[in-house]
Amino acid sequence: MPLLHRKPFVRQKPPGDLRPDEEVFYCKVTNEIFRHYDDFFERTILCNSLVWSCAVTGRPGLTYQEALESERKARQNLQSFPEPLIIPVLYLTNLTRRSRLHEICDDIFAYVKDRYFVEETVEVIRNNGTRLQCRILEVLPPLHQNGFANGHLSSADGETIVISDSDDSETQSSSFHHGKKKDAIDPLLFRYRVQPTKKEMYESAVVKATQISRRKHLFSRDKLKLFLKQHCEAQDGVIKIKASSFSAYNIAEQDFSYFFPDDPPTFIFSPANRRRGRPPKRISFGQEDSIASKQTAARYRNKAIKERDKLLKQEEMRALAFEKAKLKRERADALEARKREKEDKEKKREELKKMVEEERLKKKEEKERLKIEREKEREKLREEKRKYMEYLKQWSKPREDMECDDLKELPEPTPVKTRLPPEVFGDALMVLEFLNAFGELFDLQDEFPEGVTLAEVLEEALVGNDSEGPLCELLFFFLTAIFQAMAEEEEEVAKEQITDADTKDLTEALDEDADPTKSALSAVAALAAAWPQLHQGCSLKSLDLDSCTLSEILRLHILASGADVTSANAKYRYQKRGGFDATDDACMELRLSNPSLVKKLSSTSVYDLTPGEKMKILHALCGKLLTLVSTRDFIEDYVDVLRQAKQEFRELKAEQHRKEREATAARIRRRKEEKLKEQEQKMKEKQEKLKEDEQRNSAAVPGYGEEEREDFDTSTENKNIEQKDLDPDVVTEDEDDPGSHKRSRRGKVGQTAVKQCIKQEEMNYCIKQEPLSADAEEALRQEQQQKEKELLDKIQSAIACTNIFPLGRDRLYRRYWIFPSIPGLFIEEDYSGLTEDMLLPRPSSFHNNAQPRDPQVSIKTEESFLSESTSSLDQGPFDDSVLLPKPVHKPNRWCFYSSCAQLDQLIDALNSRGHRESALKETLLQEKSRICAQLAHFSEEKFHFSDKPQADSKPVSSRGRSSGACDISQMSAERQLELRLRDFLLDIEDRIYQGTLGAIKVTDRQVWRSALENGRYELLSEESKENGVIKTVNEDVEEMEMEQARVIVRDRLLGIKTETPSTISTSASTPQSVSNVVHYLALALFQIEQGIERRFLKAPLDGNDSGRSYKTVLDRWRESLLSSASLSQVFLHLSTLDRSVMWSKSILNARCKICRKKGDAENMVLCDGCDRGHHTYCVRPKLKAVPDGDWFCPECRPKQRSRRLSSRQRPSLESDEEMEEGMEDDDDEVDDDDEEGQSEEEEYEVEQDEEDSDDDEALSPPKRGRPQVRLPIKTKGRFGPSFPSRSQRQDPGRYPSRSQQSTPKNTAKSASKNLRKTRSAPPTETRSLRVGSRSTRHSPSALQDVFVELLSPHSKRRGRKGADHTPEHSPSFTNFRVSTSRSSRQLIPLNTAESLSLQHSESKRRGRKRQSTESSPVPLNRRSSGRQGGVHELSAFEQLVVELVRHDDSWPFLKLVSKIQVPDYYDIIKKPIALNIIREKVNKCEYKLASEFIDDIELMFSNCFEYNPRNTSEAKAGTRLQAFFHIQAQKLGLHVSPSTVDQVSTPLAAKKSRI
């Protein structure tokens, strides 16, 4: 805790009466709370004031936080104080008597810095200069310092008192202690027994004090002072140890000899009164006199001791001088005797030298002559050796591989023979490596849990034509990854989008728009990218991607590639994608380089392409993924990993080499020492022998001893030769300069001997460290090998993700590869850029050295030969004929080696002098272990098929349409897709028919279905009908073609879905048949769409378009469908239609209104009033059988209409409407997905699972990944209303079985089993779903007979008179419509109201209580008679308002327009009104007359028409709702003026939709 004004700071405690809910002021710095702001403010100011000090260091002038930080750092610094020094330092502190802390610190630091204590960790400097961390086991005192020097004084000597006249108290104290200090042992004389901290080192060793040191900053004055501050305090003016520290470390019981073998030091005492330079306050005058007398006596005592020591020293000096003089005289006498003896010997030696001088000169001349002869012979040998070395140097120089004269034949590799064409095999390997390297980044394991292999996946994908095979999975993986990554990048661009000005400046800086070609390409790509939005209602990424639509989505993606390159994301592309532009897109490059392939995709399935064409597509998709930001970041991360792994591997190798060098040097040193010892022993023996011979023969043979000595001296030459044998590396240097090097060699021998003797002790020290057991060495070696292997694996995996490059090239320029994904050593024979002369052996320029330029030819690099392959070479006799080299015309191929024996042969045959082969050989030797490990798992059968299986497999991969149709593998993909499309068309038609969502407008449905099922497509084009308008298909197609001749060309974008058959193929039958099949199947889908009632279609094909375009998405969808040129395009339109159908309205999903359960369709009847399902056993009273004719539920029964509460009894219509809508089933409401997930609904297990999956679709955003590509079949294809399903994977089983739709139970079974039966007709049980529940009434008129023929099967099944016989749903003709009632039918002319009737018929929705003359005639009669009997008009107003609010087209009129959303609305509309206002007036009985109510309604419509243009969705909804209002008003007997009925407001053409 910091000190406040150098006093402890105490926090303020919280008040005792503090309430839990009381508001207080909290000070975060001191963790205190205050009730009053003034206290809080005062404490805050105090914390920020410089009045605090650190409690540890005592540093003043700090703020509270600074003091806390100072304490933290000081305590952290104290943690590093050596623990073995704590007790010794405290013990020494206890011996001091100082009044200042820094004086104690100086005394202790001066004593401790040169002494080291037991258990202390120090650094020992070894003999070789390295530092070793050791622990002190024992402190050894010097042996010669025992006794008096070690402080063991006798009591008599220690108590001698000498009187001194000094009156200085400090001199007294220092002199007294000096008597002991002079005898203190020098700290450098101590020795220490240390033990290394590493266990593998030796146990212990004794070192000198000069070899020991503490680590830097481990023990310093500052740290010691900080430590003493924590454990010391001032007591009576003297610094003493705190009582807590004294007792905690047991200082009183400690013995200093345990820490250091010397007597404890005696420190200088400093008087306490000198602390501040002022006399102490507590000492009296009497005490001062006593202290002064004691100090005087002590000074006298010290002076006497000093005088005594001085006299003793003088006596000792006199004795020593006398002894030295005596020894000097004895030495002089001995020297004189030796001198005389030496002079006698010199005289005798002079005489002997004169006698042998002549013989010595003769021998010397003979020796010189022999020496000259030997020197000549050596010079001759040296010259020959130099020439040979020059020859070897020239011969071993690197050269062109084909110029080497010792080339060996390379082992013949096995050619690769697989189902793939040879030219595709290399690209297949590239795709395989890409998938293995980047599969983790793009979640490859989701599509291929077992991984991607060459034989099982890639070969089958490229050769086979199965639409559900590996090619589908691969393309789905690529497109999914691309779409996902592009969506993520779009989000990042949106976040980082810059201003328009900056974007413009950046675009101009990058100069992207300067190239008109790029601009044109980007414009075309943008046009192609907009096509799916215009014709399918969603973007390309949102289309349903499955095996059937894959070809078309792939083609659209290729065409739209480059559309994302805009000026808005220029900065992002420049910063994150390396300046990516449209021409960098691999798919755009494919589109530009292979336009025929893109055109072929428009009419052919991708599964029927050739392997080469498939590989081009896969190659382009790989290139597309490589340009993404995520891939670039992934590669950069692995580049960093590779760099780090290589650095670690280099360090590991350097460490291994260092250890090996040290071990080798130690062995060499030991051998040299042994040889040196032997030589010294021999020299000693020779010297002794020579001395004996000299003494024996000196008198008989004069000069013999001298001659032998000379011979001995010349033996240094032999010694020189021996030394040369020890150091063979310097032989040539000695031979080059024999005179000088010989003398220096002699000197070096002596120096080496001296150095070896000096280092012998160091070697012995090193040998002590070496003893490692064999098991430990083996374990260490295995650990290093394991670490090296892990680093190599890490490097290889990083290389696979960054840059795979060949091992090298041989003499024939063949590349050698090893791949991480497949085992084996592969050879690529690529002859591009080579000429024939480059593959032929050429004479080496080394053999004919006549021309100086030949060596230059022999050492040309590989690049120089490639660059000069077209130039002429000077080759002796061929110089006169200058011929251009011929390029090599050979197909590229791949080969492989399959065994380690072949690898050994290859390494042996490679030439070490060639440029390419030397590098290849070195690489193969380095990678030999890894290659052999791969070859051990290599299967030769996968890469080399026999000829017979290869021939048998060719027909499988061909696109024969006449092959057996029974076997799917023998079918072409086009045929497979055709059969599947027929199944799906029949299935969706059956689901629409069974679900009462509509019916195809043909004479006989069964004939139509059998024609489609049996492939008799010519029977499909009998006639087509759209919502009652009979129109032949030929007329329809002709109209479409005449209307859109230019539109199709513009929309198809360079060949999108062209109808013209391909003229490339010479066979006219196959393309024609395919075109006809596509045309008829598209026509069948068109007929199915025409048969769906408009009210059961939702976005994007709901026909509502809020924009200003006169064509809706549905219109463009129809145009695109009829101009489809491939089956995949038809599949794409089918998925869009399936996504747009309101399957929740299907009767197959009907739910009982009472028990809220699905199923048991045989016992379910539909109410003719509300179209709600009711089980016969749930109705009260129960129904014994399905009733004939009309049946109404209890709520819709006419007699119960009067029981409804009047408007006066209900506070608001809103609550009633909400209550009724809450009771309605989720099949009637589009936005009631929350009800589907309620746990209180007890449904069948399969149905509940489907409901849960549908809820997930509605609540969660669509995901791009999918578990499978196949199209499973399910009868209930519901979609979430808010989040429509994008793809097949989110709606498993979109296309149900036609044979399993009799009951909802069967549909559940079919959905769970995912089965599809393609050849069975629908059973008759499906007809009984609604049979008997209602009766069908027909008019005898001729016109009605036509509709009976066309629509009677559907009206019987569905029983919807409102859909078939009401004026809203009757078929339309030129100027008439059929108005059918129970009593009469009449033809009403439609001049201006024809469009209103059509729009109204499309706007009807299920689940609404519709009042028509046919379905509920009784209420109509009661209403008409009620008005005649005086019934109040408010009941009619109330009923009409409810009908208007519940109408689907009432959404623009429910509430007033918000002024915030539409600011200018109230500037144009002066009298705004809405249905909620009208409803409030009805509830408050504000309408006195019917005309007021009708005027408000008409004012609402006139406001809509005045503000919104005619073609907007709001105006269309107003038109339909106004027509509905007029009809209902007439039915209720309300009078609407003709002028109001005929009133049609002309909206402003320039206004846009505001609501």
Curated annotation (Swiss-Prot):
Region (Required for interaction with NCOR1): 1-133
Sorted UniProt keywords: Bromodomain, Coiled coil, Isopeptide bond, Metal-binding, Nucleus, Phosphoprotein, Transcription, Transcription regulation, Ubl conjugation, Zinc, Zinc-finger
Pfam families given in the database record: Bromodomain, DDT, PHD, WAC_Acf1_DNA_bd, WHIM1, WSD
DDT domain mapped to chain residues: 422-488
Positions bearing Phosphoserine: 270, 284, 962-963, 1282, 1320, 1339, 1352, 1370, 1401, 1412, 1416
Compositionally biased region (Basic residues): 1263-1277
Ranges of biased composition (kind: Acidic residues): 705-714, 728-737, 1214-1258
GO CC annotations, alphabetized: ACF complex; CHRAC; nuclear chromosome; nucleus; pericentric heterochromatin
Zinc finger (PHD-type): 1149-1199
Record function comment: Regulatory subunit of the ATP-dependent ACF-1 and ACF-5 ISWI chromatin remodeling complexes, which form ordered nucleosome arrays on chromatin and slide edge- and center-positioned histone octamers away from their original location on the DNA template to facilitate access to DNA during DNA-templated processes such as DNA replication, transcription, and repair. Both complexes regulate the spacing of nucleosomes along the chromatin and have the ability to slide mononucleosomes to the center of a DNA template in an ATP-dependent manner.
Subunit and interaction comment: Component of the ACF-1 ISWI chromatin remodeling complex at least composed of SMARCA1 and BAZ1A, which regulates the spacing of histone octamers on the DNA template to facilitate access to DNA. Within the ACF-1 ISWI chromatin remodeling complex interacts with SMARCA1; the interaction is direct. Component of the ACF-5 ISWI chromatin remodeling complex (also called the ACF complex) at least composed of BAZ1A and SMARCA5/SNF2H, which regulates the spacing of histone octamers on the DNA template to facilitate access to DNA.
Family per record: Belongs to the WAL family.
The protein's name in its UniProt record: Bromodomain adjacent to zinc finger domain protein 1A
